[in-house]
Every structure is written in structure tokens, then in C-alpha cells.
Design a protein with these regions (language model features):
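Conserved beta-propeller blade signature
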Residues: 77-80, 118-121, 159-162, 203-206, ...
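Surface loop/turn motifs at the tips and blade-to-blade linkers of beta-strand repeat domains
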Residues: 59-63, 100-104, 141-145, 185-189, ...
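Residue-level detector of Asp-centered blade-edge/turn motifs that repeat once per structural unit
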Residues: 72-75, 113-116, 154-157, 198-201, ...
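Beta-strand-rich ligand- or partner-binding modules
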Residues: 22-24, 29-33, 38-41, 337, ...
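Short, conserved, GDST-rich strand-edge loop motifs in beta-rich repeat architectures
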Residues: 24-34, 250-294, 604
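A short loop-to-beta-strand structural motif that recurs across blades of beta-propeller domains
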Residues: 87-90, 127-131, 169-171, 213-215, ...
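Blade/loop signatures of beta-propeller domains
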Residues: 23-55, 130, 171, 215, ...
Length: 640
């Protein structure tokens, strides 16, 4: 009865002709796995469930490579500071944009709107602070003779706070034409003042490089260090409605002065045979978000009482911008991870809001009920809010089946109107040589995959309405069987015997259940045999592998070097070593042959074998003997 039941399951997963080794199921149901795919108009929550994303509207393209800074005035006009031509653009509430000012320096690194509606712009390198009126006419407001103008903030009294580098100075300027000496507010021991922010009580906050500090200056100018991060740079600061300060810290590898490296390609999901008994690696334990030993980006929440929490960190994702939720519960984070925008709450819960498919979300800000994002290296302005897309598409990562595979069924868990399609090909990255997307499947109970046999497979989900939600997708497949390989044979010196080590003791209930001991945290590493003295013994040990993960059986043969026919010594071996009694063989020169077969894991018509010959070796069991040579010669008492 058990055999009939198992066959029925196998037939359900693979209603096709057998052509391979062990069946496998590729399951995508975790946040980590889902984030490896492409989110086109979909959000991904903390459990990995996919749902329609906010509608992302492209408002304006500057034609510049970079948008370094942004600001909004009381009328809702948006100002964009760009590089590398020093241009500032203004975009009105209807999305109409135009060049507003063209400054002499390369980069407009900072923008701020004054109390009277004027625009302040900080430029770099060898920059100045400009005041720009409503007509776009720019005049020099302050020239501190500093290399970089990194940040600007308007104080409650109307004065302009200016963060600079490479000397880490903060200036406070109340009127045009002030000298650097008279306007110096605070000279830190840091190299750069990268970010500035002001709260409703008039406190000024400064984020530094290269010490990664957050400094607070009370209205009377008294400084106090709130945070000393192990990361190099405080890249952005945002004040929440409850007075909390959110600080984005970057590591040495991604700080402002460093070029942004291209993320490493995501490894492909590998084939996992359904009942292969290969040792399973222990799962990597989740790190505390307070463990910053390998962090690239970190977001801190500094509470009004001075305490601080880490609410987000990533060893892989580089973040560049923050915008505080007006609810007081967390921030939006703009990244260089496919231009993705994440939402993180104060308790550390993380959700992918949307993916812009741009290289970098350089600034994030809100106005009224909408959020705005600027991107680089195509300087664009986007808007999104509460309205959801009418249709979203999620494309999975690519499954690498390790060999050409026959596809079985695909089934999933969803709510609302969700359609699934598949495609396959033999190149690692989908291109024009792949098959077209299959016809849409709508029954989540599953259907046979129609994509052709290939090494790689991808699926996509189309979410057709606002109620659509996808939480899991499963793909069954059967990789083509690949012959095992015998990689090496070693013949040990005479008199060394090999014996198996005692097996690891396992609860008999686990053994009889048929479950993998690894499911119970029992790791059984392959153990090398014990070497013992055994007079006359000749031992051999070999290494072999099977790319399908099939269990292998071995046979050992031998022949004299001058013969052509091998004789069987032992078959159906499951261990990769064997010892023979050397006294059972006549003196001479011999060769071993090892064969490996995966027949135990495959139907007979698909089983494959491999073989390898050893180097010749000598058997010499005869005792040494002394024989006379020539006639003895006697001289006195000496004979030779």
C-alpha cells in the first residue's frame, strides 16, 4: 500500500516519462527568496507575500545623470539639484519641469527653502552657497572657501546652517556677505558634515564623516553627541513627528567619497534532489540587527530622551536616503538595490514598498499625502501615494536545475486574481534564446508546466487586482541523470588496513521514520576510515561524486598487469574504501578498477556508471633469501 501511495504522489508531480535522477521541488515562500526576484509594480511584505504596490508615476526627467539634492516650497514646487553640470530644475504640482538655475560648479549637493520662499543651493567642489530668487536669478550668499558644501538647513530664526568638508565645520549665516570667521558656528574634529536637520524645538542635528557621529546643538549652540556609530558616515538625518531622529549610517565601502560598487550577482537556486541523503548544512542563524560587524547600511532611531535603537541594517543593500513616516512609526529607505524603496517600522519590521528599476534612490521626501523619490544615474523624479497599480508583475529568480530538466507541475497559494506563467532556457540570464512565456495558469491547485526541457526555469506572477496576494509558489522538476565520477584512487602502503569508524548513534525512532536526521539537528559528516596495522594488507581508498546527489554503490576489481580481464573482488559497497589480504594474491604487478553506479537511486533504464583504474602496484609476499654468487676465495682467516 505504501508503494502505491508513493507512486501516486510521484505521478501527480511528474505526469511525464521518467528521464532523470531524483525528483526535486523548488519552493519560493520566504522573504529572502522572494526579494531575489524582480518586483515590477508589486510590494513584498515581511513574510515574503507579494501584493500590488503603490502606483509609481514618473513626473520629470532632468536629462542629467545625478540628482544630489531636493527641496519643496510652500506652494508644492519641487527643486532638484543635479550633477555634473550644476543645474537646478523646478517642477510644479502638475509635473511640469524646467531649468531654474545654472550654477558654475559641478554638483548641487544641497538645497533648502528659506522662510521667505527663496532657494539656497550649496555646490561642490570648491563650492559656494547661492541664494536664488523666484525668477531663478542666483547670487552668492556665502563663500566659506571650503572644498565641499554638503548640507543646508534653515533654523527657526531664519539663519542658514551650512555643513562643509574637508574640515568638518558648521557655519550659521544670517545675511549675505558674511565672512567665514564671523559665521563659524562650530568647528568639529570630523572631516565632513554630511547631513543637517532641525527639529520643531530649534535643535540642530549634524551627521558626520569619518567618525559616524550624530551631534545635537541646542538653540543656544551647546553641542552634545547623541550617537557614535561604528560605521563611517551619517549620510542622512530625518526628524520624525514625535521628535525622534532617524540617522542613516554608511560603512567605509559605500561612504560618500567612495564609488558605489556593483552588487554581486545573486546565486541561482540549485537543484535539491527529493530524497538524496547528502548532508544538509546547518541553517545560517539570523543575526541581531544590532550586530553591525558586516553592515553596509544602518538606520538608527534616536529617541527624544537620547536613547537609540537600530531599526534596520543590511550587509548587502546600500541605502542613500530617508523619509520619516508622518505616523511616527519608522521611515522609508531609498537604496541602490534596483532602486528599491523599503518601509521599516520602529520595531524593525521591513517591507519592500516598490522597485523603481533605477540605479539609486538618491533622495526621498513627502508633501501633503504623497511621497517623492529622485533617482540617479538617470536623474528622474517620481511620485507615489495611496493609489495602487491596476496590475503588478513579479518575476522570480532563475532556477538552475544543474542539468537539463523535465518540468513537472507548478502550484501556488494566492488570494484574489493571480496568474502564473513559466519560461525556460539554457543560458543563465534569460534572453531571446529562451522560450516565450507560457499561457497563463489561473488554478492555484496547479498544472503541468508546458515550458520545454532546459537547464534553467523562471516563473512570473501577474497580480490582476488590488485584492491579489501571492504567498508561495512550488515547482516540481526532474533533472537529467548525470553519470557519477571517480575522482581519485589511492593505494596505501603494505600492512595498513582500513576499518569503518563506529556509526553515529541515532534515535531508532528517527531511523524507522525515514526522516532525514538533519531535520532534528543531527549532522553526520562523512568520516574517514580508521587505519590499523594488518599484516600483508593492501588497502585502497577513493573519492567519488554525483552531481545529482544520488547515493552511490561501488565495486572493486583487480587483474595482473599483463592480463586483460578484471576479476571481481567485492560489489555493492557503500563505503569508499576496501582492504584485501595481500597474501591471497601471488607475487606480481596488479591494477585495481573501481566502478560506481547510481542504480540504487534511479530506475534501471536510467542508471549510470563510472569507472577508474589505479596505478599499477606490486605484491611481494616472498621472504628474502641469500644465494651464493661465484666461487669462495680463502685468504688466511678470511673468506669471500
Amino acid at each position: 500500500m505504501k508503494k502505491i501511495f508513493l507512486f501516486a504522489i510521484f505521478a501527480f508531480l511528474f505526469p511525464i516519462q521518467l528521464s532523470a535522477s531524483q525528483p526535486a521541488v523548488w519552493t519560493v515562500n520566504t522573504r529572502e527568496a522572494v526579494l531575489k526576484g524582480e518586483a515590477r509594480g508589486v510590494s513584498i511584505d515581511e513574510t515574503g507575500a507579494v501584493s500590488p504596490a503603490p502606483d509609481l508615476v514618473e513626473m520629470f526627467e532632468t536629462g542629467q545623470s545625478y540628482i544630489w539634492s531636493s527641496a519643496t516650497d510652500a506652494q508644492g514646487n519641487i527643486y532638484l539639484g543635479t550633477g555634473s553640470d550644476g543645474k537646478i530644475f523646478r517642477v510644479d504640482t502638475a509635473g511640469r519641469g524646467a531649468l531654474f538655475a545654472d550654477l558654475a560648479e559641478l554638483n548641487v549637493a544641497a538645497l533648502a527653502v528659506g522662510r521667505s520662499g527663496e532657494l539656497f543651493a550649496g555646490t561642490s567642489p570648491d563650492g559656494k552657497v547661492y541664494r536664488i530668487d523666484a525668477s531663478g536669478t542666483a547670487s552668492v550668499f556665502f563663500d566659506p572657501k571650503e572644498k565641499y558644501i554638503w548640507s543646508l538647513a534653515v533654523l527657526p530664526d531664519g539663519a542658514l546652517a551650512i555643513g562643509t568638508g574637508e574640515k568638518g565645520r558648521i557655519y550659521k549665516v544670517k545675511a549675505a556677505g558674511a565672512s567665514a570667521e564671523s559665521a563659524l558656528f562650530f568647528d568639529t574634529s570630523e572631516t565632513h558634515i554630511i547631513s543637517l536637520a532641525v527639529d520643531r524645538n530649534g535643535n540642530l542635528y549634524a551627521g558626520t564623516d569619518s567618525g559616524g557621529m550624530v551631534l545635537r546643538f541646542s538653540p543656544d549652540g551647546k553641542p552634545f553627541a547623541l550617537l557614535d556609530s561604528p560605521l563611517r558616515e551619517i549620510h542622512d538625518l530625518e526628524v520624525g513627528p514625535d521628535g525622534s531622529v532617524y540617522a542613516l549610517a554608511l560603512s567605509e565601502t559605500v561612504a560618500t567619497a567612495k564609488p558605489t560598487p556593483t552588487p554581486a550577482p545573486t546565486p541561482r537556486p540549485a537543484a535539491t534532489p527529493g530524497n538524496a541523503r547528502t548532508p544538509r548544512p546547518a541553517p545560517t542563524p539570523s543575526k541581531s540587527r544590532y550586530d553591525l560587524s558586516s553592515a553596509r547600511s544602518v538606520v538608527y532611531r534616536i529617541l527624544p530622551d537620547g536613547g537609540s535603537d537600530v531599526i534596520w541594517n543590511s550587509p548587502d543593500v546600500t541605502a542613500f536616503s530617508l523619509s520619516a513616516h508622518q505616523t511616527g512609526n519608522g521611515v522609508l529607505i531609498g537604496t541602490s538595490d534596483k532602486g528599491r524603496i523599503y518601509s521599516v517600522t520602529n520595531d524593525g519590521s521591513e517591507r519592500l514598498v516598490l522597485q523603481t528599476n533605477e540605479n539609486q534612490v538618491s533622495t526621498l521626501f513627502s508633501h501633503n499625502r504623497n511621497f517623492y523619490a529622485t533617482t540617479s544615474s538617470h536623474g528622474k523624479l517620481f511620485r507615489f501615494g495611496d493609489e495602487r497599480v491596476k496590475e503588478g508583475v513579479y518575476e522570480s529568480s532563475v532556477l538552475d536545475a544543474s542539468a537539463a530538466a523535465s518540468w513537472g507541475r507548478i502550484w501556488w497559494r494566492s488570494e484574489g486574481n493571480v496568474e502564473i506563467q513559466t519560461r525556460s532556457g539554457n543560458t543563465e540570464t534569460p534572453d531571446e534564446t529562451w522560450s516565450a512565456w507560457s499561457a497563463a495558469l489561473t488554478d492555484q491547485k496547479g498544472a503541468q508546466i508546458s515550458s520545454p526541457t532546459a537547464k534553467f526555469l523562471q516563473w512570473r506572477a501577474v497580480l490582476k487586482n488590488a485584492a491579489a496576494r501571492l504567498s508561495e509558489v512550488n515547482v516540481s522538476y526532474l533533472p537529467r541523470n548525470i553519470a557519477p565520477e571517480i575522482l581519485s584512487i589511492e593505494i596505501l602502503p603494505t600492512n595498513i588496513g582500513l576499518q569503518p569508524n563506529p556509526p553515529v548513534m541515532i534515535d531508532p525512532n528517527i531511523e524507522t521514520s525515514g526522516l532525514d536526521p538533519a531535520e532534528f539537528g543531527i549532522v553526520i559528516p562523512p568520516a574517514a576510515p580508521r587505519r590499523v596495522y594488518q599484516r600483508g594488507a593492501r588497502s585502497l581508498i577513493w573519492t567519488a561524486e554525483d552531481r545529482n546527489g544520488d547515493r552511490l554503490e561501488y565495486a572493486v576489481y583487480y587483474r595482473e598487469a599483463g592480463e586483460k580481464t578484471f576479476k571481481l573482488l567485492k560489489d555493492k559497497l557503500t563505503e569508499n574504501f576496501y582492504t584485501i589480504d595481500g597474501f591471497s594474491l601471488a607475487d606480481g604487478r596488479y591494477i585495481f578498477k573501481i566502478t560506481a553506479t547510481d542504480a540504487a537511486a534511479n530506475p534501471p533504464e536510467f542508471a549510470l556508471t563510472a569507472e577508474r583504474l589505479s596505478e599499477p602496484f606490486e605484491i611481494d609476499n616472498s621472504a628474502p633469501r641469500v644465494v651464493p654468487v661465484g666461487q669462495p676465495q680463502i685468504t688466511g682467516d678470511t673468506a669471500r
